[in-house]
């Protein structure tokens, strides 16, 4: 039995195209405790699961925010994968929640947008969507690398678990420790930043979500860290 929760980064993405149904189903089959996925808004305000900012539609590349869901659904996400697998289309968050919220212990949703206003629209859409999922408060962790988005999440989705995502001191320098502990249930530093600054980050007293772990030795090293509760990885350990 694992000491911590092992979360599949964009699904089991070493053996399947990331952020696809195939990757999520593989993570379930092989026994990951949960999924990490990025969520963004389409032009027609649908929440989709993707880490990509741009997609090629026809002969032109467009921003995701300029493409409607119906056109995104025409794109085969498995086309560039390292091995030949069945066609995969982009998933809406609703589709993911309907199939994968129940079987996994946790789903980690990273709000990827860089624009504050766009993130607020996404949070509002998310609040409406989650009203229909009884297990959402228990199983979801909502993450952002923008502290204003964290605050807005807490305003619109009270009692949901939130986490601040960061990889440098620059992201922390303008925030007080009290601000962070009052607004976040977790801290989510990347592996290398946490490795260099673990004592400082542990002083916040918040459990750690650590991303992205690469290699068995690194995974085993953090197994004995009492602050680390989640390890995010694309590989099964």
Swiss-Prot record:
Hydrolase: is it a keyword of this entry? yes
Q: Which Pfam families match?
A: GDPD
Report the SUPFAM superfamilies cross-referenced here: PLC-like phosphodiesterases
Where would I find the GP-PDE domain in this sequence?
Answer: 4-237
Q: Which UniProt keywords apply?
A: Hydrolase
Question: Which GO BP terms, alphabetically?
Answer: lipid metabolic process
Domain of life where this protein originates: Bacteria
Single GO molecular function:
phosphoric diester hydrolase activity
- Gene3D superfamilies documented for this protein: Phosphatidylinositol (PI) phosphodiesterase
Where does the sequence pass through the membrane?
Answer: none
State the family named in the UniProt similarity comment for this chain.
Answer: To glycerophosphoryl diester phosphodiesterases (EC 3.1.4.46). To M.genitalium MG293.
User: Can you say what this protein is called?
Assistant: Uncharacterized protein MG385 homolog
Question: Which species does this protein come from?
Answer: Mycoplasma pneumoniae (strain ATCC 29342 / M129 / Subtype 1) (Mycoplasmoides pneumoniae)
Q: What is the lineage of its organism?
A: Bacteria, Bacillati, Mycoplasmatota, Mycoplasmoidales, Mycoplasmoidaceae
């Amino acid at each position: 039995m694992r000491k911590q929760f092992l979360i599949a980064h964009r699904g089991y993405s070493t053996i399947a195209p990331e952020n696809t149904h195939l990757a999520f189903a593989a993570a379930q089959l092989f026994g990951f405790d949960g999924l990490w996925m990025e969520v963004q808004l389409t032009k027609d305000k649908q929440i989709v699961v993707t880490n990509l900012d741009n997609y090629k539609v026809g002969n032109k590349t467009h921003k995701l925010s300029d493409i409607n869901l119906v056109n995104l659904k025409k794109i085969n996400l498995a086309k560039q994968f390292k091995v030949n697998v069945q066609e995969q289309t982009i998933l809406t968050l609703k589709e993911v929640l309907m199939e994968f919220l129940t079987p996994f212990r946790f789903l980690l949703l990273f709000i990827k947008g860089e624009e504050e206003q766009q993130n607020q629209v996404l949070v509002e859409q998310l609040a409406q969507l989650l009203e229909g999922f009884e297990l959402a408060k228990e199983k979801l962790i909502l993450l952002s690398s923008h502290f204003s988005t964290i605050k807005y999440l807490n305003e619109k989705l009270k009692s949901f678990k939130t986490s601040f995502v960061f990889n440098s001191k620059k992201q922390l320098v303008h925030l007080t420790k009290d601000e962070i502990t009052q607004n976040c249930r977790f801290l989510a530093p990347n592996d290398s930043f946490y490795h260099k600054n673990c004592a400082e980050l542990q002083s916040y007293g918040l459990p750690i979500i650590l991303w992205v772990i690469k290699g068995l030795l690194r995974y085993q090293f953090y197994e004995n860290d009492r602050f680390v509760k989640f390890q995010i990885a694309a590989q099964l350990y």
